[in-house]
Structure formats: structure tokens, C-alpha cells
Amino acid sequence: MTVLVTKTLRDFGVRRLRSALLLLGIIIGVAGVVAIAYTARNLAGAQRAAYLSASQSDLFIGVRNFPTGLENVIQENDNVKTVESRVSDYLQWSNGGPYRDVLIYGVHDFSNIQINRPTLIAGRWPGKGEAVLDFSSQRLQPVAIGDTIALRESVATAPVYARISGFTRTPGEADASIQARATGYAPAADVQMWRQEPGDNQLLVRLTELRRATETQQAIMRVLNKRGIPHGPGVIRDPQQAVGTKELGALLLLMSVFSVIGVVLSGFLVWNTMAAVMSEEMRQVGILRAIGASRWQVLRTYLLPALIVGVVGSLAGIAVGVAGGGALAGFLGGLIGLALPPFTLAPREILLGLLIGLGVGIGAAIFPAWQGTRVTALELLRNYGIRADYGVGFVQRLLARLRGTSAMLTMGMRNIWRRRVRSVVTMLVVGVGAAAFIGTQALNASVSHTIDTLYATYAADAWLSFNRPMNVQFTGELARDHDIVASEGWVRDDAYVQQTLTDLWGIPADTRLYLHAVTDGRWFLAHNPNEVVVTANLARSLGLHTGDPLTVVFRKRQQTYSIVGIVDDESTYLGSRATGKVFMTPENANNLRGRADSADFFAVRFTDSSPSGVNAALRRVEQQFRVYEPQALAAYEDRSNTQNTIRILSVLLDAMVIVVAAIGVVGLINTLILNISERRRELGILRSIGAGGGALIGLLVSEGIVLGALGYGIGLVGGYALARYLVALAGAELFRMQFTLSPYVLLLTGVLTLVVAAGASVAPGILAARLRPIEAVRYE
């Protein structure tokens, strides 16, 4: 064993660059898988900690003018563990720039926050005339501790001012850059003064037993009704669901696909290198076999280096993967307001890294090593050199007919076929890298195209809501504004169909602002209390068809309708757990909810739909209806927020493609270096007869370009299949997507593949150019 170890270490020392490339390939493969596993575990732990935390409210009830002291009455319920009231207000804030949205919570005692407790990460809690902001608010506009910001209800109201005393992290609150909204905290008295209403408007309850939440909710509502306090229906927390869980799961699943691709490429790299080592040392293997060495004794001679590289690559890959996974988990956790648990290295990550590293190292090496030991000693001891097959093969005959090409280019094109298996493996590595690029670009394009299509379904420029329920006929008042060319009162709420949560929408039958794409049947008619339309994804999920009866349940009320049509609309929002939509008239939706003929919000279209035109029109609308404290969401802003969220997916997938491409580059460089090692004598002869360094660089670059071009051909086929798979996978996790693949992506992939292949070939070309002829010719 001492001799074997000595030989192995000597081989590593002699072939430093090859060994480094081999090690790098395994490190990248292991690191990718470990990073994904580490990220998934930490995010899952952070979500469990946040949503099982003693700080999280189990029950939220919107109230109006909740008096101080009534918490003690609610606290008497045996299932109420803690109860707090707060006041919140949607405002706009500015630090010298454009006004942006902010949700301000008013807290009575910052030293004794028991429910939904934010973490102070800089500065101090605010006093009178002060406020703190979530740290991610700095991504919306520059703001620092000590700055004085302006706050206003709308453009029609005079601003108030607050000094920033610190920054917080809000549990479970998505990043401000995703929501396009900041989150802040201020003394409750200040927020009540800004609202010009006494009392609180939020009731937060922590329960002893979550399974009794509905019973406790009804008991609290009886208390509120008895005292004449207006309130909403209440929301019970689902500890199994967190904002962004579905989206994060889809992202990690897609990234896992690319990490597996990286592992496969690492295996190709090890296989290629071990095959080259066996071809180089055929004579040594023959000598060992001739003096009586068994196949196992010879085999372990070549498996030990693979074992060492596998162990070292695994350990280094685990370290890199944990570091990368920590950065990735921190980034993703910050986007949805999750604080990561303290650093821990789970045994499964160590085991996973070792299994992959050793599996790739030994598993990929054992086949070429075993194949090499199958040859008899006599065949191994024969001269293993160049065969007289010039012009014999099809490719050689084809190249011989080329005219107008340099000798070096022709030689480079011919040389890649001297080691066919090695070249094919290298083409596969390059092809997988090209396929990964095509797949991600197709996924990005499909997501963007689908989002564009979904937003095109809505012809509204903005959505308006007010501080009180408004009758659907309020559209007549809105029509008096000369900027508004169309307005409709819409209803939206949660409902259940066959125990499946869905979105209930009330939209006028003659709507002009919802461009329904009916795929089967028709749109519902006005004044028909029994007709509904469902989305295609809800129909697929529940097996619904046109003409089927449909029972819709809203809390304790339910109504059976007839499905008259199916529309293609899979638009959703961050954190949504609903499947599809059910459309009916606003009258029918309000009847189901047991409410008056009211609208939850109004869809409006302006004469000028440009962002500047929409902003100007909204300012005038807010001024005109300032008594109702209008809140507006511009459609272009909502679309921009969605695109910002999708951009995160694109950036992270592109990062994984870079990792895959890096392995492909390493594989190409490794192949060319192996070729140089085997052809030192030829290269020395070329130098001795006058070939310059530039000619040898051109020779290697031409080989790399040919390998890249052929790999690109493989990548075209594999890329289309991978693109289809990724789009289908993402569609199953998020929303159904329209497959989009531009010919320009295929052209760009080809150009990038050739450029990268040529660039990766320069370094081996320089090594070839630096060979001294006398040393190269002496090489045995």
C-alpha cells in the first residue's frame, strides 16, 4: 500500500493541472447539491420557527375604534393565550423623492410587544414624532437613521413628518422591493392622530389550542357585537402555509434540476480523465499483468486516485456548498421576511456530499479502469502508438476534400477523431451546458410571455378602494371624472368548491375591463342568479365541465350554480393558496356573501394609459374623492412588482447555468490538455520544423471550436427537451405557462458556445506553444 500511495501522490504532483481540473469538477458538482439541500433545510426551519413562534398571531380580526381595556374581557376566554390591539394605516412616504406606499403599525408599548413582534436591528424604538422602518425599505428609496420622512394619506392630504429612529425586520413580511411597499412602526397615538380616528383597528390573538380557533373566533365576535364594535370576519392562521412557500419550493426544485445536471457533468469529467490515464499507462498495466498482478490489484492502483480526489472534492464541495447555501438561504429568506436559524451542519448534508463526491469519483472511474484491465498482457505490451489510418475513415476522407483551409485548421478538425470516445464525452459536456442555457432562457421567456398575456386580460389602468364599503353604482360618480373612460365595481373574496380554496370574483356581465378568454361555453349573462364561469385550472383540478352544477361555499353560506363557461386565466399573486377562480355577477357574489350591493374595489381605465398619465389621473381622482380616503394600485406598478419577483427566479437560474457552464469549460480544457499530453511528440516535431506558437494556439483553438460546434448541435436537441421539461415543471408548481422559445436564443446559444469554446482553448494552446522541441521529442 505504501508503494501505491507513493505512486498516486507522484502522479498528482506530475499532473498538477489535470488533477486540479478533476478536483474542481467534483467540487462544483458536490457544492451545487449541498447548497440546495442546505438552503431548503434552513428555509424550512425558518418557516417553522416563524409560523410556530409564540410571537405569531393565530387569529386576526379587523375592527374599528377598538377601545383600550377591552382586551381584558377577551382575555377571559379560556382558549385565549394573549391578545393585543393595534392601529394600522396605509400611507405614502417620501424622503425627498417620489412618494411610495408604506403600511404603518401603531404600537402602544414597544417594550412589551407580545404578538407579531418585530426585531430591532439598528437604532432604537420610536418615541413621539418618530418611526422605524423595515430594513428592506431602503431598497425603495434611500433613508437613514435620523432622516425625517414625509407621510400622507393621499395626494389630496397634507403630509405629516416623522423622524426615523431605527430599522426592524418584520416576521413573515415579504421584502419591500417585492411588495413595492414599505413596512413601519410608530407610537399608536401618532398613527391614530394621522388617521383622525380614535381607537385601534386590529385585534391580534394568540390561542392556546389552534384546533379550537373557529370556536374562539365566534366567541370573540359575540363580545364585539354585544358592544357594538364594527368588525370583519377574521382570519385564522394556517401554520402549514407561509407567504412564498409555493414559490420558494418551485425555485428550489428548478435549481435542484441544475444541480443534478452539474453532478452528471462532473461524472463525465472524471470518466474522461480516467480513460485518458488508462490509455497513457497501457504499457505499465501490461507489465503489471505480465509479472502476475491480478485484475483487482491493477484496478485498485487506479481507483485509489479516484478515491482520494473524491474524498478531497467532497470535503471541499461540502464547505463551498454550505457557504453558498448560507448566502442563498439568507438572500431568499430576506425576501420573505424569515430570520434564518443559527448555523448548523446537518449529517444529511455531509452524507449527501460524500455520497456524491465518492460516487462520482469512484463510480465514473471504475468503468474505464475495469475496461483497461480486461486487455491481455500481450496486447498491452505491444507498441501503443499511432495507427496508419490516415484517410481511412469517413471524416478523414471528408476533411481531405476541403479546400481553402489552413493545414493547422484541417489538422485540428482531424485530431478530435483520434480519441472518439473522449471527444464524444466532451461534446456531451458542452452540449449539456448549451442545453441548460437554452432551457433557462426558454423558461424565462415563457414566464414573461405568460405574465404579459395574463395582464393583457385586464384592461384596467388602476384599481381603487375606499375607507368604507361603496355601492356598485358608485361607478356613476367615478364617471364624472373626465380622466376616467370606464369604471366597474368588482367583488373579490375567498370561497370553497369541493373543499378546495378558490378565488370568488364578482364582475359585471357586460364588463369591458376584464377581457375574458372563453375556451369552452360562454360568459355568464346579467341578472341570471344561477350562472358562473370557472377558470381552466380549477376545471382541470376538480374535473369540472360546462353544464356541471357547482356548489360554492362562503363561510357558512352556500349556493349551487351552473357552469356555463370556462376561461383561460391563471393569474395569481405571491403567497396565494387558492386554486383558480369562480366568476359571477357582483349581485350574485354579494348575495352569496349575505351583503348589500357593494363593491370591494373599482377597476378604472383612463384616457391616458401611460405611467405618467395614470399617475396624474390618480392624483386628480384622489383629490376629487379625498373624503373617502381612496387607495389606488396602478396596473403598471402591479405588473412591475410581478416582474421584479420573476427576475429573482431568472437571476438564480442564470447563476446555476453559469455553474453548469463552468463544468463544461473545465471539461473542454481537460480534454485539450489530455490531447496535448498524448501528442507532445507531434507538437515538438511541429515546433522543430518551424511551426510558431501562434500556429499551435490556432491548432488547439480549432479543436475547441469544432468540439464546441458539435456540442452545440447536441445542445439544440437536448435544450429543446430540457426547456419543455422546465416549463412544464414550473407550470405544475406555479401556474400553467405558454411555452416560448425564440430562434434568437438558439442563435445566441451557438455564438456563446463557440466563443466560450475558443476562449477555453487558448490556455491549452499557450501550454502547447511553450513546449521546448527538444524536450517534447524526448518524451516517451
Task: List each language-model region with its residue ranges.
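C-terminal transmembrane helical bundles of large multi-pass transporters
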Residues: 489, 599-605, 617-620, 624-723, ...
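Short coil/turn motifs that cap or connect alpha-helices
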Residues: 144, 294-295, 376, 545, ...
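N-terminal Sec/SRP start-transfer signal
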Residues: 1-30, 303, 391-432, 701, ...
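Juxtamembrane segments of multi-pass membrane proteins
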Residues: 59-64, 405-528, 533-537, 545-548, ...
